[in-house]
Amino acid sequence: MTIDNPSAFLKTLPTGSGVYQIQDAQGKVIYVGKARNLQKRVSSYFRRQLDSKTQAMMAQVQSIQTTITRNENEALLLEASFIKQFRPRYNVLLRDDKSYPYLYLATHQKFPRLDFYRGAKKAPGRYFGPYPNAGSVRENLALIQKLFKLRQCSESFFKNRTRPCLQYQIKRCTAPCVGYVNEQEYRRQVEDAILFFEGKNDQVIIKLTERMEVASENLVFEEAAHYRDQIRQLRRLQKQQIITGGKGNIDIIGIAESNGAIGFAILFIRSGRMIGHKPFFPNTPLGTTLQTALVEFIPQYYLSPLRNGDIPERIVTSEPLEDRLWIQRALSSGLNRRLAITDQKRAPYKQWQAMAALNAAQALSQHLAQKNTFALKLEAIQKSLALPNPIARIECFDISHTLGEATVASCVVFGEEGLIKKDYRRFNISGVTPGDDYGALRQALTRRYVRLKEGEGILPDVLLIDGGMGQLRQAAEVLEELQVSGVILTAIAKGPGRKAGLEKLFVWGRREEIHLPADNIAFHLIQQIRDEAHRFAITAHCNRRAKRRVESTLQEIEGIGPKRRQKLLKYFGGLQELQRASIEEIARVPGVSETLAKAIYDACHQHKG
C-alpha cells in the first residue's frame, strides 16, 4: 500500500502477526521484517526519533506491503523466505555458501570404506559431521586411518587388488582387499571408529585394553603391542581435544563488531567434541546492532537447505538474543525437531561463549585487513591503467577447448573482498564453428550481458578479456549492440615467447599497448584474475569433454539402448552421480546385471580427467 497519509495507513494495518515489506519508488523491496503485532511494529517506523540506519531507509519508502500469518512462528519462517527471495539492502544478508563436508562410512559394504563426502545424503551408510571445511575433514580422515586402519579406496580399486597398496605399508590400512584381515576383525575396526566418532573414547579404550590383555595372555605380543599403541594414541588425543563435558551436538555462535562491520564465528560441537569453527561475514547495513544482526542471522543460517538437515540440539549465543523463545519455537516448528537456544552466560557454556566471541573478533579483524588489501589493489589498477573512476568489481572471460571440441567460456568475478565465487559463471558454447574463439566469446558475452541488463546480477566496472585487440574488439561490439555503457573494456595478451611477466595490456579506445613492470601490484592482480578465469575454463571444459565421451561410450556398450541409458541416468539423478557410483551400486539398477554394471563402470572411468 502506498503511503500518502501515514496516520490513515497505519489504522488499516492488522494487529495480528505477520511480515511486512518496505518498498522504494521503483517497487524494489529494501527491507523485510516480522512482527507479533503488525500495526504496532510498522507504526514504530514513523516515530520522530529514529536511528541513522532507519532514517536512511525511511527516506526511500514509497509503500509497505503486509502479509498476515496464522501465528508468530509462521511470521519468522516467512520473513526468512522473503529475505532469501528479495535480498533487501537494509537486511543482514547471509551469503550463499557451499554445503558442508562429511566423513562417509559405507556400512552397507562387506568391508566398509571411509571417505570425504559433500552433497545430499542419498547413499546408505553413516555420515559424520558436518565439518566446517574440507581441511578439517581430511585431517580427521587421516587420524581415523592411523587409529583404526579403515580403507579409503574405491570399490573398483578394492576388487582388483592382487597385493596390498602403499596404505598397508605405511600402516594406514589392514589390507582387506587381499584377505590380510577377515570380515569379523574388520567389523571390529569399523565399530571402534563409530564409537570414536560418537565421542565414546573411553569405551574404545576399554575394548582395546581387553583385547591387549587377551593377546598378552596368549603370548601374541606383537598384537598386544599394536593395541597398546592404539590406546596411547587415544589417550594422547583425549588430552589434546577440547571436550565440552556434554554428549550432545551444540553450535556456539560468537559475534563481534568493528568499524561498522559485523562478523560471526560458529564453534561446532559434535558428540561432546569440538570439531572446528567457521567464520561468516554477512552483508550488514551500517548502524546494525549486534542484537539485530544475531536475530536476522540465525533463521537464515539454520533454515538454509545447505544445512542438509544437520541441526544441533542446542544453539548457544555469545550475546543476548532478542525474541529468543519466539525464534526457538519457530525454528523447532520449521525444522520439525526440538531445538533449544541459550544466551545466558553461565556454566557449562560461559567459556565457550567467550571463545566463540574471541574467534569472531579475530576472524573479523583478519577479514577487514584482507578487504583493505584488495581495495588497495583495485585502486592500484585504476591508477596504473589511468582509469577515470574507482573500481569495485571486475569480470574476466576466457575460452577453453581441445581442437574445437567441448568449447566452454568462463566468467570469474573479483571485488573488494577478493574472488566472488558465487558469481562465477560458465557457458557451454554451441552453434559456433569449432575453434572459433571470437564466435565463442561473442556468444558468452551476449548471454552474460543480456542477463545483467535484465537485472540478473551486477554490471562490472571493468571487463577483462584473456586475449588481444581482436578479442577486445568482439567485446566492444557485443556491449555496443546490447547498449551496455559504463563498463571499461580491457584485455591481457601473452608477451613474446608466452613468458609470464611480459604480457601486454590493452584498454579499449586507446591505441598504445600498456606494459607494467613485473613487480607492479596492479599487474599481479590482473595476472591472478586472468589465471583464475583460465583455471575455471579448463576445469569446465575437461568436465564437459569427459561427459560427452562417456555418453558416447555408453551408447557403444552392448545392451545399453536409449531407454536403459535414460533409466540409468534417472536412477542416479544424472551422469555425475552415475560416474561416482560403484559397480555394486550400478548393479542395483533394475535390469542391470553385474557384468553389465562392470562394463558401465569401466566406460564411466575410461575418460575421467
Curated annotation (Swiss-Prot):
The keyword Chloroplast does not apply. Its main location: cytoplasm. Belongs to the UvrC family. Keywords: Cytoplasm, DNA damage, DNA excision, DNA repair, Excision nuclease, SOS response. One of its GO terms (biological process) is nucleotide-excision repair. HAMAP family: UvrC (MF_00203). It comes from Coxiella burnetii (strain Dugway 5J108-111). The lineage of its organism: Bacteria, Pseudomonadati, Pseudomonadota, Gammaproteobacteria, Legionellales. Gene3D superfamilies: 5' to 3' exonuclease, C-terminal subdomain, GIY-YIG endonuclease, UVR domain, UvrC, RNAse H endonuclease domain. InterPro entries: GIY-YIG_endonuc, GIY-YIG_endonuc_sf, GIY-YIG_UvrC_Cho, Hlx-hairpin-Hlx_DNA-bd_motif, RuvA_2-like, UVR_dom, UVR_dom_sf, UvrABC_protein_C. Residues 202-237 form the UVR domain. Residues 15-92 form the GIY-YIG domain. Interacts with UvrB in an incision complex. The UvrABC repair system catalyzes the recognition and processing of DNA lesions. UvrC both incises the 5' and 3' sides of the lesion. The N-terminal half is responsible for the 3' incision and the C-terminal half is responsible for the 5' incision. CDD domains: GIY-YIG_UvrC_Cho (cd10434). SUPFAM superfamilies: C-terminal UvrC-binding domain of UvrB, GIY-YIG endonuclease, RuvA domain 2-like. It is found in: Cytoplasm. GO terms for cellular component: cytoplasm; excinuclease repair complex. This is UvrABC system protein C. Disulfide bonds: none annotated. GO terms for molecular function: DNA binding; excinuclease ABC activity. It holds the Pfam family UVR.
